UniProtKB/Swiss-Prot annotation:
<feature type="transmembrane region" description="Helical">
    <location>
        <begin position="31"/>
        <end position="51"/>
    </location>
</feature>
<dbReference type="GO" id="GO:0009922">
    <property type="term" value="F:fatty acid elongase activity"/>
</dbReference>
<keyword id="KW-0444">Lipid biosynthesis</keyword>
<feature type="short sequence motif" description="HxxHH motif">
    <location>
        <begin position="165"/>
        <end position="169"/>
    </location>
</feature>
<dbReference type="GO" id="GO:0005789">
    <property type="term" value="C:endoplasmic reticulum membrane"/>
</dbReference>
<dbReference type="GO" id="GO:0019367">
    <property type="term" value="P:fatty acid elongation, saturated fatty acid"/>
</dbReference>
<keyword id="KW-0256">Endoplasmic reticulum</keyword>
<keyword id="KW-0472">Membrane</keyword>
<feature type="transmembrane region" description="Helical">
    <location>
        <begin position="122"/>
        <end position="142"/>
    </location>
</feature>
<keyword id="KW-0276">Fatty acid metabolism</keyword>
<comment type="function">
    <text>Involved in the synthesis of fatty acids. Elongates C14 fatty acids to C18.</text>
</comment>
<keyword id="KW-1133">Transmembrane helix</keyword>
<feature type="transmembrane region" description="Helical">
    <location>
        <begin position="64"/>
        <end position="84"/>
    </location>
</feature>
<dbReference type="GO" id="GO:0034625">
    <property type="term" value="P:fatty acid elongation, monounsaturated fatty acid"/>
</dbReference>
<dbReference type="GO" id="GO:0034626">
    <property type="term" value="P:fatty acid elongation, polyunsaturated fatty acid"/>
</dbReference>
<dbReference type="GO" id="GO:0030497">
    <property type="term" value="P:fatty acid elongation"/>
</dbReference>
<protein>
    <recommendedName>
        <fullName>Fatty acid elongase 3</fullName>
        <ecNumber>2.3.1.-</ecNumber>
    </recommendedName>
</protein>
């Protein structure tokens, strides 16, 4: 049975066509908005109304299962996307040949013939949108809606939901939905980074949920630092693609929507995470009042 499942799974993801999913998402733009409204109700209304007079629910078992699932899910996503990103980065000629992009012979090779250019600007459906990598990039875009269940655990256990937590969940969910529909080339960077960071982050949450918080607590600032580094790289990717497309006027498969919203998101995340890191681990005044909150928040990329 396992062999049959494995064979069916391999056959499905190897023949996956992201275009069909993108068309469905394009035809259903109300889905992320409805999810967003319901999420805001969960964050802003439920704690002050439904849960105000209720005791916190004991969701430890469910929380353990949930974090274990997201850990394994993120590891699988990283397993498929990260090696492919590295391969495309180290062998840009393969991506350029498949993309069909015609380059000006006088253009600096540092700008438009490098691995960074090919992995951020030279989209080829056969590389990023279809097949096994395309399948996990698609799951990345879709997973941002169910990942908001993170917040439900906090709300129904009557734990605080800080602004960074729900702001990040909400904006990433909306961005991923519409950026996927627009087939932005830099999406592989975002998916690879997010899967990688989440593999570590949800593993931390899983161990904490199992009752071993003290064991992994020293890793909390490291996790937050890695998240900050993710935001730095994301900001660099967005700024680079903007420069290539609008300053140099070269071909780059990104949209103005993804450039503008991506820049606002990554810069705001960078500022908020940096502030959180400082208040949690560097500021003597706030260390006691915000104990290890940086790695406790259910956030992400």
């Amino acid at each position: 049975m396992l062999m049959n499942f494995g064979g069916s799974y391999d056959a499905y993801i190897n023949n996956f066509q992201g275009t069909f999913l993108a068309e469905w998402m394009l035809d259903h733009p109300s889905v992320p908005y409805i999810a967003g409204v319901m999420y805001l109700i969960l964050v802003l209304y439920v704690p002050k109304s439904i849960m105000a007079s209720q005791p916190p629910l004991n969701l430890r078992a469910a929380n353990i299962v949930w974090n274990l699932f997201l850990t394994l899910f993120s590891m699988c996503g990283a397993y498929y996307t990260v090696p492919y990103l590295v391969k495309a980065f180290m062998n840009p000629e393969i991506v350029m040949a498949a993309s069909g992009i015609k380059l000006d012979a006088n253009t600096s090779p540092i700008i438009t013939h490098s691995g960074f250019y090919t992995t951020t600007c030279a989209l080829a459906d056969s590389f990023y949108f279809n097949g096994d990598v395309g399948f996990w990039v698609a799951l990345f875009a879709l997973s941002k809606i169910p990942e908001m269940i993170d917040t439900a655990f906090l709300v129904f256990q009557k734990k605080p939901v800080i602004f960074l937590h729900w702001y990040h969940h909400l904006t990433v969910m909306l961005f991923c939905w519409f950026a996927y529909v627009q087939k932005i080339s830099s999406g592989l960077w975002f998916a690879s980074m997010n899967y990688s960071v989440h593999s570590i982050m949800y593993l931390y949450y899983f161990v904490c949920a199992c009752g071993h918080r003290r064991l992994v607590r020293p890793f909390a600032p490291i996790i937050t630092f890695v998240q900050i580094f993710q935001m730095v790289v994301g900001t660099i990717v967005v700024c680079y693609t903007y420069t290539v497309k609008h300053v140099l006027g070269r071909s780059c498969t990104v949209t103005d929507f993804s450039l503008h919203t991506g820049l606002v998101m990554y810069v705001s995340y960078l500022l908020l995470f940096s502030q959180l890191f400082y208040r949690s681990y560097l500021s003597p005044r706030d260390k006691a009042s915000i104990p290890h909150v940086a790695a406790e928040i259910k956030k992400k990329e």
